Each structure stands twice: as C-alpha cells, then as structure tokens.
Amino acid sequence: VGPEIVTEAMLVLDKVGEKFGHTFNYNEFLACGCSIDANGVPLTEETIEICKNADSVLLGAVGGPKWDNQPSQNRPEKALLGLRAALGLFANIRPAMMYKALADACPIKPEIIGDGFDIVVCRELTGDVYFGEHGRRESTNNWGVVGYDDMNYSVYEVERIARRAFEM
C-alpha cells in the first residue's frame, strides 16, 4: 500500500501546487517492504542520504503481512526507525479533539469529557522503546516463554521531548 498511497498524495500535492502557484519536485526511492523486495534491506544508505538532502520526505505505509516473518533487524519498520534517527525526527505530535456533538460516540465518561476536549499528545519517537532490546526467552520460573521490552531513556531524550511539548 505504500507506493499507492504516496502516488495519491503526490496528486493531492500537485493540485495544491496548482491552486497556490507552487511546483513540487519528486524523487522516488524505496524504503520499508518495497526496499526489502528490491534490495534485501528495509533502508539503503542511498535512500538515507537522499532524504537528508531533501526539503521533505513523503512516506507511505511501512509494511504488511508479506514481511511478517523477516528477522527483526530486517523488518519494514526498521526503515522508519532508521529515517527518524538519521533525520533527527524525535517528536510525534498527535492532536485529538472531541466535540460535544460527538460525545455519545466517545468511550470516555461524559463527566470526564464535559463539553469536549482539545489536547495534543507529544510522544518521543527515537528513544529506547523503539531501539531498546526486546524479544522472547524462556522464563526462569517455569512460566514458559516470556516477552521482554527494555526501555531506557537518557536525560537528554527526556528533556528534548519535554521541551518540544512545552514549546507548542
């Protein structure tokens, strides 16, 4: 779905450009599942360098069931993580609004949402929850296989995301 989404997004951008007198120039490179198929890896150094020198990057869907059995270091989402790290993209900014007219559709209790809400969630994208050690191992207490996901964040990473959130 990645290339198909990007193709449609480019059509939309071109229409916006027509309306506002702007021309977009596109250079297409493979990443994620498409890159695994073509290059054997989710992200090539060439793609990283091209993205570093671009004004912006338009990325479609990351993967799909076709790549579910890839080793963890070669899964499609590794491209997304690699691009985030290479481009210094550390903040995921997610606005959320609930209008009073839609309150009945919200799973949050009415006494909590009141007349609705307008919040922004600022989430860290390059720290250890994404890059930390995770996997499966045999438990030491006969519980069978257990999963683990270690998360460690530096003071710098915590301060950086907090600063970004408070600057909004």
What do the predicted segments below correspond to?
Residues 1-4, 18, 23-25, 30-168:
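Anion-binding alpha/beta catalytic cores of soluble intermediary-metabolism enzymes, centered on
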